[in-house]
Amino acid sequence: MKVDQKGHTITIKDTQGDFTSFLDKVSQSKTAFDTHNVIIDLSHNPSVTLADLKLLLPLAKQHKKLKKSFVVVAEGIDFNAVPAQLSVVPSNLEAHDIIEMEEIERDLGF
């Protein structure tokens, strides 16, 4: 797991390719990321499935309650099948764009 911080955003990358152990590490350290927007970068793990992404829903919901963004970067996923509560995009650039838009919405009171 690799963690990069840029401004109010933390990017967490899966470097091992083992989603289960990655999810455990992220879940154990979730309180350290509560004050930041989070990007979960799974783009280097082609074996990630929709079922795996759904395991991130509790983390995403908790983060949204704290008025912070939670975006997942994954490739090879049917984006139409992803639950609406989970933001999944195909690239890091789009993840940063989603966070910017959500911050503007929060600033405007939406």
Task: List the model feature ranges, each with a label.
Residues V3-K6, T11-N37, L42-F110:
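Amphipathic, Lys/Arg-enriched alpha-helical "gate/interface" segment within cytosolic domains
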